[in-house]
């Protein structure tokens, strides 16, 4: 594993290994490469056919791959866990060959997620939710609570755990919603606007308040905010076997986008 010192290294890697028929999950953009290189968090490794980009996160590396030969193994020698996600559309297109490649290299299956969407139509009427006990997070206490819930309840490797700086940025834009129960902070929902889509990034309820309809209140508030903003579509990712969450989203009109990922982990 070699640290990337400049963008020219990435340009060479992509030019050399991104070929017709290359299997890849590499969706990093140029500005992301530049940002991660500047703080020393980007690394690469390769052989004569396959290449790997490692993005260092808090306690693990996220792996982006360019595979041109699947019937071989690779010796991964990272000192921290490695995690990757493989995107596919529909169970009939499940990438078994890619899964086998990673299993031969010592990776194990971790989590599977599905994407759900909801069109923003006239049916999503704007409601008066002032009595819903959901507010927009705005204080240091709210930020700390959001950070604690995300760190405590979401999967470390695939939960997209946000830094304090990222949470502060979302709060400053009015995109973190806080549910209260009898004045106590009970749950959060973090949203984001991207290209006309209003994404649900994180929805977490403190264990003390589960079963009290907190998630539903947060979801309704989020849908209302999207209707006010006239977004084109709502979208989210949910763990495939999280029946309670899937049921909640379906109840509010979300449909499966036929787009899934499964993650693999090497400790």
Each model region followed by its residue ranges:
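Conserved active-site alpha-helix within GNAT-family acetyltransferase domains
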Residues: 92-111, 216, 240-258
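A short beta-loop-alpha structural element at the N-terminal edge
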Residues: 1-15, 131-146
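Acyl-donor-binding surface of acyltransferase catalytic domains
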Residues: 67-130, 263-265
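Conserved acetyl-CoA-binding loop-helix of GNAT-fold acetyltransferases
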Residues: 69-82, 205, 211-224, 228, ...
């Amino acid at each position: 594993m070699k640290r990337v010192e400049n963008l020219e290294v990435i340009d060479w890697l992509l030019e050399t290994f991104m070929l017709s028929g290359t299997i890849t999950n590499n969706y990093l953009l140029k500005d992301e490469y530049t940002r991660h290189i500047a703080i020393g968090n980007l690394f690469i490794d390769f052989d004569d056919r396959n290449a790997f980009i490692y993005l260092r996160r808090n306690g693990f590396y996220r792996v982006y791959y360019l595979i041109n030969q699947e019937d071989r193994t690779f010796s991964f020698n990272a000192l921290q866990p490695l995690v990757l996600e493989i995107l596919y559309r529909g169970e009939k297109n499940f990438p078994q060959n890619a899964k086998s490649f990673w299993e031969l290299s010592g990776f194990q299956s971790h989590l599977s997620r599905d994407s759900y969407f909801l069109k923003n139509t006239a049916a999503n009427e704007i409601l008066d939710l002032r009595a819903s006990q959901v507010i927009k997070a705005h204080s240091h206490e709210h930020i700390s609570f959001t950070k604690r819930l995300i760190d405590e309840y979401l999967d470390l490797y695939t939960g997209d755990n946000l830094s304090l700086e990222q949470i502060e940025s979302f709060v400053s834009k009015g995109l973190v919603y806080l549910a209260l129960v009898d004045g106590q902070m009970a749950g959060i929902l973090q949203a984001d606007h991207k290209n006309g889509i209003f994404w649900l990034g994180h929805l977490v309820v403190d264990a003390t308040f589960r079963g009290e309809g907190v998630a539903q209140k947060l979801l309704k508030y989020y849908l209302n905010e999207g209707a006010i903003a006239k977004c084109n579509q709502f979208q989210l990712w949910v763990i495939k076997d999280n029946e309670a969450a899937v049921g909640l989203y379906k109840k509010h009109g979300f449909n499966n986008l036929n787009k899934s990922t499964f993650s693999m982990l090497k400790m």
